[in-house]
Structures are given as C-alpha cells and as structure tokens.
C-alpha cells in the first residue's frame, strides 16, 4: 500500500480524535457511496416493477434475494484477492499481484459455471420451498435472463480489488453511479415499453441487469489496461497459465469470508421464504421494509470496509493506541448514523413505504399498512446490524476470519432464524415475528463479535509487550 494511502487511513503522530474522524470519512465515504449506488440499482428495479402490481413486486423480491445469495457467496472469494494484491503491491511485486488477480478470475468463472444449474432450476426450488406458483414462475423467468449477468459482476468484483489496493477506490464509485443511471433509464424504457420498444415487464429489468453488469466489467478492464499504475500488471498475459499456490490462497482466505457474508444474507433470503408462506401481501411488505433496511445498511457496510483497512494498517505498525482510537471512532460514527436512521424509520414509515408501491393499486393499502409496521421494527434492527457489520470489518483487519464465521453461523441460523420461525408461526406474530427474530439474531452476533474483538486486541497487546 502506498504511503499516501497509509497516511489517509492511519493518522500519524498522536492520532487525535478529530484526525481519526477525518481519516475514517476520507476512506469511508467513497466506499459507502459505491455501496449505496450498487443497492440503488436493485431499489430502482423494485420501484419500477412495483408499479406493475403486488405480485410482480413479490416476484422481484424473491428474484433479487435469489440472485444476491448466489452472487454474494462467490464475491467472498473476490474479496480475498484484496489483501493478496495489497501485499504484493506494497512489495512492488507485480508478478504476484497479477497471479492473484488471474486466479481470482479463474475462481469467478468456475463459480459461475457451478451456479448455472441453480438458476436453471430456480422455479422448481421456489415452488418446493412453498412459494406461490405464479410468483415462482415470474421469478424463474427473470433469473433465466439475469444469470448471464452474474459472471461479469463477479469479474468486476475481482478487478475492483486491484483498484482498491492501489488507493484508487474513487473509480469504483464513479462506475457504480454510471451503472445506477444506466439501469434506471433503461429499465424504465424496457419494463414499460417506451420509444417504440415493446413492454417487457420484469424480463426487461433482467435484460438491463445483464447489460449494466457487462458494462461495469468492460469499463474496469479498460481502466486497468490503460492506466500507467495498473497496466504494468498485464492481467491477461498468459491468462490460461495456472498458479496453484495463488489459487489455493484465494480459496483459503475466501471461504470463511464467503461463509460469514452468506450466513447473514441467507438469513434474509430464508425470511423471504417464511414471508411467502404467510402470504403475498406480507412478502411484498417485507420486501419494502427489507429494501429500506438494506439501503441504511450500506453505510455501516462501507464503514466496515474502511475499518478493515485502518485497523489492518495500525496492527501492521504495532500501533495499538491508534488501533483502539480508530475502532472507537468507527463505532461512534456507525452508531450515530444508525440512531438517526432509526428515528427516521419510526417517524415516517408510511411515507418511506409509498416509494415502492403505487398507492392507487387495489392491494396497495393492505401492503403499505403492513410494510409500515415492519419499517418501524427495521429502525431498531439498523443499530444492531450496523454494530455487527462494523465489528466484522474490524476483525478482518486483524486477519481473524474463521472464528467470526462460526459466530455468525450460530447467531444467524440456530438463534435468529429459529426464533423468526417460532415467533412467526407457533407464537402467532406472523411477519412481525420474523423481523423480531432478525433483531435477536443480529443482536447476538453484535455482542459475540464485539467480545471477540476486545479479547483479541487485549491478547495481541499483551503478546506485543
């Protein structure tokens, strides 16, 4: 990592609280912006498709969750490339960086091929899981097209690892904003049929998703192939040649990261399945509340990525004073933002929900009323979700991935999902019970991960003395 990036992420000297605040924002804002823009793409699709009715919106919720679960597990291996490339970059070793990136792309291609049968059988899987056959059919048609966008999306994630490692994360924000604008304009045209083009409905949104993901990959390839600081890596020279050490390193680092991310994401996907079993209205309302919560989550997620860099650099320097101060500041920023978001969700839930469904539709009143009650619970959910996300980032900065993955699995599934099902069905709370299970599961994760981080820092401080 270049000295300029280190200077931005870990303040020199005494490391005042203000310098930590400033450094966190300098690193975190572009990452947060990129996350928000990425989520905005799916949010735009929901807003547009929601105008077609509750059934189409419910199908869009399932399709988005289905695609995201498959994507996010594969992206964990792409995330693993970042520290490998960063270390090679710091050593001036372009060859090792190129090999890591190449093997990261190999893994992405292999993963996409392995995932194709899941997409081909999406409708059958959803019907088996108790979803409404009509909703499952709409979802299956969408995913039959969207599967072609998975590969460029994964490859883009690998190459953004190089861009981040050399301190050029701003380009990720720029390309994601372009993707957001392209997606909104093209989806509006193809879904409803404007400028002489036929109305394609949900399938139009799927076509646009493929185009936008392909554009992002082509854009970042052009960037790394033409910029002086990146074209020296010669990423596609002898692309066919394997490097088994780099390949196994990507797999070794990526698996626990993928498991950690997937454990939380699949909790939400499973909750959508539970909601679908309760009813179409509840599933549509759940999708609205979940999308709002997901938008808010992009802020602690961006801060989590910043936390990994800042704590990792401080630990490498053996500077525990700045490590602790950086951690406290990131916690403070995350909690402050979550509290503001929670107040907003509690104050105007119906206003927020109306963005996702045309109030004039016959079923809109029932969906919006139910969604408003879930949005209030989502306000509480924000705080604990933000804490556990930031703490996971701090632990990655200490290169601690295996134990957090285990803690996440325990918190999300045996605790969170089990309680969600129990409160929804045996206890009779319905969809609200699912969300209460969310809150308890993520609260457990927040506590366990925070305890793990505190104990680990104390142990490493003791060892360093």
Swiss-Prot record:
GO biological process: monoatomic ion transport
Statement: the UniProt record of this protein carries the keyword Transit peptide: no
Subcellular location: Cell inner membrane
Transmembrane spans: 61-83, 104-126, 141-163, 170-192, 202-224, 251-273, 283-305, 326-348, 368-390, 403-425, 435-457
GO CC, any one term: plasma membrane
Membrane topology, record value: Multi-pass membrane protein
Record keywords, A-Z: Antiport, Cell inner membrane, Cell membrane, Ion transport, Membrane, Transmembrane, Transmembrane helix, Transport
Source taxon at top rank: Bacteria
GO MF term list: antiporter activity; xenobiotic transmembrane transporter activity
CDD domains: MATE_NorM_like (cd13131)
Residues making up the signal peptide according to the UniProt record: none
Entry-linked Pfam families: MatE
Family, as annotated: Belongs to the multi antimicrobial extrusion (MATE) (TC 2.A.66.1) family.
Role according to the record: Multidrug efflux pump.
The protein's name in its UniProt record: Probable multidrug resistance protein NorM
Species of origin: Agrobacterium fabrum (strain C58 / ATCC 33970)
The organism's taxonomic lineage, starting at the top: Bacteria, Pseudomonadati, Pseudomonadota, Alphaproteobacteria, Hyphomicrobiales
């Amino acid at each position: 990592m270049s000295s300029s990036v280190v200077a931005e992420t870990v303040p020199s000297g005494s490391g005042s609280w203000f310098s930590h605040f400033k450094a966190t924002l300098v690193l975190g804002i572009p990452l947060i912006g990129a996350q928000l823009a990425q989520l905005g793409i799916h949010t735009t699709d929901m807003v547009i498709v929601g105008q077609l009715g509750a059934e189409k919106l419910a199908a869009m919720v399932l399709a988005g969750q289905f695609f995201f679960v498959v994507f996010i597990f594969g992206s964990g291996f792409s995330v693993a490339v970042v520290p490998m490339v960063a270390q090679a970059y710091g050593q001036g070793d372009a060859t090792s960086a190129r090999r890591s990136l190449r093997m990261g792309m190999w893994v992405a291609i292999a993963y996409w091929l392995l995932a194709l049968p899941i997409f081909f059988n999406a409708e059958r899987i959803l019907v088996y899981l108790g979803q409404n056959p009509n909703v499952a059919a709409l979802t299956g048609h969408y995913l039959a097209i969207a599967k072609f966008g998975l590969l460029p999306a994964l490859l883009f994630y690998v190459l953004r690892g190089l861009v981040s490692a050399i301190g050029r994360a701003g380009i990720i924000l720029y390309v994601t904003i372009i993707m957001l604008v392209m997606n909104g304009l093209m989806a509006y045209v193809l879904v409803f049929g404007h400028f002489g083009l036929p109305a394609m409905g949900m399938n139009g949104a799927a076509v646009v998703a493929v185009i936008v993901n392909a554009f992002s990959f082509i854009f970042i390839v052009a960037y790394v192939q033409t910029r002086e600081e990146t074209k020296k890596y010669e990423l596609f020279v002898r692309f066919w040649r394997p490097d088994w050490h780099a390949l196994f390193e990507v797999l070794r680092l990526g698996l626990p990261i993928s498991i950690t991310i997937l454990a939380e994401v699949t909790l939400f996907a499973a909750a959508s399945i539970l909601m679908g079993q309760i009813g179409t209205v509840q599933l549509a309302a759940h999708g609205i509340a979940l999308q709002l919560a997901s938008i808010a989550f992009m802020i602690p997620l961006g801060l989590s990525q910043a936390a990994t860099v800042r704590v990792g650099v401080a630990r490498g320097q053996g500077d525990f004073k700045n490590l602790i101060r950086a951690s406290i500041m990131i916690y403070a920023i995350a909690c402050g933002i979550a509290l503001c978001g929670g107040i907003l969700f509690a104050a105007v839930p119906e206003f927020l929900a109306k963005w996702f469904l045309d109030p004039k539709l016959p079923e809109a009143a029932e969906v919006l009323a139910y969604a408003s009650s879930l949005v209030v619970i989502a306000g509480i959910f924000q705080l604990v979700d933000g804490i556990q996300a930031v703490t996971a980032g701090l632990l990655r900065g200490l290169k601690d991935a295996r134990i957090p993955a285990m803690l996440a699995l325990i918190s999300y599934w045996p605790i969170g999902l089990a309680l969600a099902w129990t409160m929804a069905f045996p206890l009779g709370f319905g969809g609200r019970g699912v969300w209460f299970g969310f809150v308890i599961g993520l609260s457990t994760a927040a506590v366990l991960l925070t305890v793990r981080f505190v104990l680990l820092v104390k142990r490493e401080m003791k060892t360093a003395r």
